[in-house]
Amino acid sequence: MKLHRTTLAFAVAAALALPPAVMAQQPAPKPESKQGQNKGGLAQGDRKFVMEAAHGNMAEVELGKLAADKGASDAVKQFGKRMTDDHGKANGELKDFAEKKGLTLPADLDAKHKQLRDRLAKLNGADFDRAYANEMVKDHKKDVADFKREAKGAKDPDLKAWASKTLPTLEDHLKQAQDMQAQLKSAPRAAR
């Protein structure tokens, strides 16, 4: 009987000592993560949109300058000037937003837009005008779709408001680009 009590006492002591030892081996529970957040609290999807918008705005400014300089038609030159002005303004607003959220915007074009700029820079006259108009239609269709999606689904209310405010300008750019594209398609090609 004495052996039974000793065994029982040992078992109780072991049972009481075991939980702290097991707990010490388990990793501490992680605090609830804010998945997709950065230090400024911006959701990953919103952050991606901001970066893409910044690259797009920079590209529109650079390509607009190129169009204002190289464009053969007045329509292309004027559209290029508008792109420089409107997208320069939009990028300034986006920069202010990014600073408030602790984001650093890119300082230069991404590879895709550099390649586009370099390709267009090699063209002249009507060839440049048509290629530029085609790119502006393609880019603004994508921009309008992206801004509509962000105006409805952005997690950040300030970003949602900015996307909503900017969307009508982009829709107008798309309409103007389509008109310019149609005008250039109907213009006679120069003799080769």
What are these language model-derived features?
Residues K2-R192:
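His/Met- and acidic-residue-enriched segments that coordinate or traffic transition-metal cofactors
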